[in-house]
Each structure stands twice: as structure tokens, then as C-alpha cells.
Regions:
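Short active-site oxyanion
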Residues: 1-5, 80
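Mixed-charge interfacial surface used for oligomerization/domain docking
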Residues: 4, 10-24, 29-31, 35, ...
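Class I S-adenosyl-L-methionine
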Residues: 36-104
């Protein structure tokens, strides 16, 4: 049985990884002022930052039912079944829209990743590997639903202005973070974003403490794969963190991805995170 994997563009996988794994994306909409663009198609993170610096508002919108249906029908032309992995349903209407579209297409399975960015991307890679190993759609869906509680997704923000503009952080909290030079760690837990540890100091130093903290309990870390994701950063920061990560822990595979336009719209520049799997769900 030939199974094709599709995912929301918020998976933030590199073009090379998508090509290697045969993953087709459903692009979310990015609004810069009154102009609409498609994530990963005709807008870049640099475009987002430039627009915001010039006073434009930046918003995102879910893939609509028609767009999903068109994607599913096109992909199904050369396969027996499609499994679509969505950004967490508590973050976006994408999941509900994809489910509606799937009902019109047949043999399309929609999975709520409960995640975002490369947390979603990591699940998509595992999804393809299961399909290539001969798993049935039902087996893959069941495995993904169990896996989402094992994905450890987090990132550190250099600034919270973009979160505030997107309504995910109060103005008071944003002002306080700026005045105190706080770099918050944002974590995904049970399908929602929560604030973890708060760091102070230079962005690079905060990132080192963050990486060390995340990998402190080694007994719970699955060392098969780690993914480092970042939005446009100061020169050398991502490379520095990649090297530092190698001194803290030894993963079998390390993948580096850049945050796409949708994620950048909410986190802004100078955001970096590491994503890996845990052996057991967080308590």
C-alpha cells in the first residue's frame, strides 16, 4: 500500500528534508498589512521582520477547507492513502478544516500533532519512516497519537514583542520582560504554549543555559534524533549553539532547520529551540 505524507507548513522542515522524505506541505496564510501570502511559497521570515520594522501588522490564518481538499485530491492521484499531520488544534483551525476536507476525499487520515514548528516536523519524519517500513495507515495514526506526548518542543525568545502583537503575551508581561532583560523559554505542553524557565543575560549565554537545562535529566532523553530550529539570528549564534549542543549530549542524528514565516510571525527574530523525544511523557 502506497502512503503519502502531507503536513502543515508550520513543520519548518528544510526543502532538502522534505524532498528526501517526500513530504508535501499545506501552506498557511501570512497577512502583512492587507496583503496575503503563503508560508514557504512567496514570503520569507526576513519579509516578516522587515514588514514589522516598518510598522505593518503581521497575522496568520489557517489553511481553509478548499485548499486542503485540493491538496489531498492532488496527492492522492499517485497513492492509496494520505496521512496529514496538522499543527496542534489548540493553536489553529487547521485541524478542523483538514478533517472536513478529508471527509470529501476518502482514505485521508488527519492527525493532530499537538505541536508546532519542528516538533511537528519530527513527527512527520517518523511518519514517513513508518510508512516506508510497511505500517498501515491505522497503525501509523495510532503511533503518532502516542508519540505526540513524547515530543519535547521548546524555544527561547530574545524578545516577546511578536508574541504580544499576536495576542499570546500581555503588554504588561512584554514590558516587564524587556525592562528586566528576560529571555523566556516557551514550551509546548499538552498542546498549548506555556512559559518555562526565564533567563537573563546575553542571548548566547541564555541559550547555553537553556540547552543544558533541557538535557539535564538524561535518563528521560531519547538520543536517536535532535532538531535545532531558529529564526533569523545574529551572525554565528546558531552555529555556536550547534557546537555547544554537541558538547552537552551526543545524539545519533542532529538536524538543523530554520523557522518558517508562520512561526516567525509569532516569535520574531533571535529565537532558537531544540526539539527531541522523551522516553516517557512529561509528568
Amino acid at each position: 500500500m502506497k502512503i503519502r505524507v502531507t503536513a502543515d507548513s508550520t513543520c519548518d522542515l528544510s526543502p532538502e528534508l522534505r524532498a528526501s522524505y517526500g513530504i508535501t506541505l499545506a501552506p498557511l496564510t501570512v497577512m502583512l498589512g492587507e496583503d496575503a501570502f503563503h508560508d514557504g511559497v512567496n514570503v520569507t521570515p526576513q519579509d516578516i521582520i522587515h514588514a514589522v520594522e516598518n510598522g505593518k501588522t503581521c497575522k496568520t490564518a489557517a489553511v481553509n477547507v478548499y485548499e486542503y481538499e485540493e491538496l489531498f485530491r492532488r496527492v492522492k492521484e499517485d497513492c492509496d492513502a494520505v496521512i496529514h499531520l496538522c499543527i496542534g488544534k489548540k493553536f489553529s483551525a487547521c485541524y478542523d478544516n483538514a478533517c472536513q476536507a478529508a471527509k470529501q476525499c476518502g482514505n485521508v487520515y488527519v492527525v493532530d500533532s499537538g505541536n508546532l514548528s519542528v516538533g511537528l516536523g519530527m513527527m512527520a519524519l517518523d511518519e514517513v519512516e513508518m510508512a516506508r517500513a510497511g505500517k498501515t495507515p491505522q497503525e501509523i495514526v495510532q503511533a503518532l497519537e502516542a508519540e505526540r506526548d513524547l515530543i519535547d518542543t521548546s524555544f527561547v525568545l530574545d524578545q516577546v514583542d511578536y508574541l504580544r502583537n499576536g495576542g499570546r503575551c500581555s503588554g504588561v508581561a512584554a514590558v516587564g520582560a524587556k525592562l528586566l532583560h528576560i529571555k523566556p523559554c516557551i514550551e509546548v505542553e499538552k498542546g498549548v504554549m506555556v512559559v518555562g524557565k526565564k533567563y537573563r543575560g546575553s542571548f548566547a549565554r541564555c541559550l547555553e543555559h537553556y540547552v543544558k537545562d533541557k538535557l539535564e535529566d538524561r535518563s528521560q532523553v531519547d538520543f536517536s534524533r535532535v532538531m535545532l530550529a531558529y529564526s533569523p539570528c545574529e551572525p554565528g549564534v546558531a552555529e555556536q549553539m550547534l557546537n555547544y549542543l554537541g558538547t552537552v549530549a551526543e545524539f545519533k542524528e542532529t538536524l538543523v532547520c530554520t523557522a518558517g514565516s508562520t512561526i516567525c510571525c509569532h516569535c520574531g527574530p533571535n529565537t532558537l529551540g531544540i526539539i527531541f523525544k522523551r522516553k516517557t511523557p512529561k509528568a
